[in-house]
Every structure is written in C-alpha cells, then in structure tokens.
Amino acid sequence: MAVQQNKKSPSKRGMHRSHDFLTAAPLAVEPSTGEVHLRHHVSPNGYYRGKKVVKTKND
C-alpha cells in the first residue's frame, strides 16, 4: 500500500484540488425554435441545427 513520505500542507492540498470543481453543461439555443438544449444534442422538439431530424409525438 502506498504511504506518503511527507505531509502535504493545506496550501498544496488546495492547489491539488483546484481543478476538482464541476462545470455547468454548455447549452445552445435552437435557431429555428428558440429552445435551449445541450450542445451537439437534438432539441426536445426534434430539431438539430435548424432541421427537423426526429419525429415527435406532436407531429
């Protein structure tokens, strides 16, 4: 089992953890409907990059 040789100071511990935060998912607005969706995903209305690509229940 690995055992540390020297204690890591609170400052170094904080520097090590500085990139552990979560980031918000990037969102995009569908140009044809104005709906917000995840980037590179089809919007709930079935549109992707201004074109209808999936049939929905309302269609």
From Swiss-Prot:
UniProt region (Disordered), positions on chain: 1-23, 35-59
Compositional bias (Basic residues): 49-59
Keywords associated with the record: Ribonucleoprotein, Ribosomal protein
GO molecular function terms noted in the UniProt entry: structural constituent of ribosome
GO biological process: translation
A cellular-component GO term for this protein: large ribosomal subunit
InterPro entries in the cross-refs: Ribosomal_bL32, Ribosomal_bL32_bact, Ribosomal_zn-bd
Superkingdom, natural source: Bacteria
Keyword Nucleotide-binding listed: no
Keyword Repeat attached: no
A Pfam entry, by short name: Ribosomal_L32p
HAMAP family for the chain: Ribosomal_bL32
PANTHER family linked to this entry: 50S RIBOSOMAL PROTEIN L32, LARGE RIBOSOMAL SUBUNIT PROTEIN BL32
UniProt similarity note: Belongs to the bacterial ribosomal protein bL32 family.
Protein name from the UniProt record: Large ribosomal subunit protein bL32
Organism, as annotated: Paraburkholderia xenovorans (strain LB400)
